[in-house]
Amino acid sequence: MNTIWIAVGALTFLGLVFGAILGYASRRFAVEDDPVVEKIDAILPQSQCGQCGYPGCRPYAEAVGLQGEKINRCAPGGEAVMLKIADLLNVEPQPCDAEEQQAAPVRMLAVIDENHCIGCTKCIQACPVDAIVGATRAMHTVMSDLCTGCNLCVDPCPTHCIELRPVNETPDSWKWDLNTIPVRIIPVEQHA
């Protein structure tokens, strides 16, 4: 019985020693991040779609903050994100890339043909925003509220049952930005 307590005590002691060493090392050798990069990364939509030419939002934020990359390359964020980054960096706003300069940009949505889906989960693994739900060997579907239309789920599908379709804007599907809609308070006379 004593050997069990000795083993438990030794493992506890080793855990505490190695934990203290790791705690010291994490503080001693910590790399400070650039606060500007952190702020730019917080502004970006975190869709990790790669449409900007970088593998995710963090590398794009580092390129903008440290290497002077153009601030107008985030397609999912569009003009709103570009204006926030321009304000943060105190630079002139730039026109969005050619794809973004359409008169009325069309929101795209991934659609799965559920009759041909084999439930391989490759699309789920490829989706950067977890907009696809389903289980192995079961039907998958796309949650339209979360899908950014980044096109990353289309190529991994072995049965080619995923396609991007334009979303028809209706009052139910429209993203109402209540901060930009002017609100006027109309005085109302109260009668007794």
UniProtKB/Swiss-Prot annotation:
The coiled-coil regions, if any, are none
Report whether Cell inner membrane shows up as a keyword of the record.
Answer: yes
User: Ranges for the 4Fe-4S ferredoxin-type domain?
Assistant: 108-137, 138-167
Write out the annotated subcellular location. Cell inner membrane
EC primary class? translocase
Q: What keywords is this UniProt entry annotated with?
A: 4Fe-4S, Cell inner membrane, Cell membrane, Electron transport, Iron, Iron-sulfur, Membrane, Metal-binding, Repeat, Translocase, Transport
Q: What family does the entry list? A: Belongs to the 4Fe4S bacterial-type ferredoxin family. RnfB subfamily.
Could you identify this protein by its name? Ion-translocating oxidoreductase complex subunit B
User: What's the gene?
Assistant: rsxB
